[in-house]
Amino acid sequence: IMKWLPGASEGTVVAGGNGKGNALNQFGSTISRFYVNSSKDIYVLDHNQYRVMKWASGANSGTVVAGGNGSGSALNQLNSPNGIHIDSSNNVYVLDKGNHRVVKWAVGGSTGTVVAGGNGSGSNNNQLFNPASFYIDSSENIYISDTGNYRVMKWATGASEGTVVAGGNGNGGALNQINEGSDHIQINSNG
């Protein structure tokens, strides 16, 4: 990951830059999702290494803060991670697409806690099916683009199941449906 200052003719490597691999100073694939907190720490979703890494500002290598134990369904593993969110306490939320769940990793934790889904793939309100993206609001409600079910789900903090807030009536163009391929979500200030 490169940082480019305005007007600069070249950038500075701030994370990675040591070839492809699984060492703590490498990434296993092209990086598509990362997050920078107010302390300038960089959280990187390393999809092919099934991990989220934190690179402290100015560090030469990262630390694994979620996953990193190969692909799988145990609470210390991820399977096709597809999104990250870092809250104000630096807890890491991972959209674990292959396990049809969202997992929260507390700072310093070695395992995550399922906060949405995690009951196999399906269409019940306690399940997700190929979730594609998510958004977490200031009250820690989780909104999930549940693309396999053509719906958007809202999971309140501590809830064992979500509620459908959009779609959920199959693929299509009717006012109560979501089209296939609707895989991004954004919530405005009105919720």
Which residues does each PLM region occupy?
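Intrinsically disordered, low-complexity repeat regions of secreted/extracellular protein precursors
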Residues: 25-28, 74, 79, 87, ...
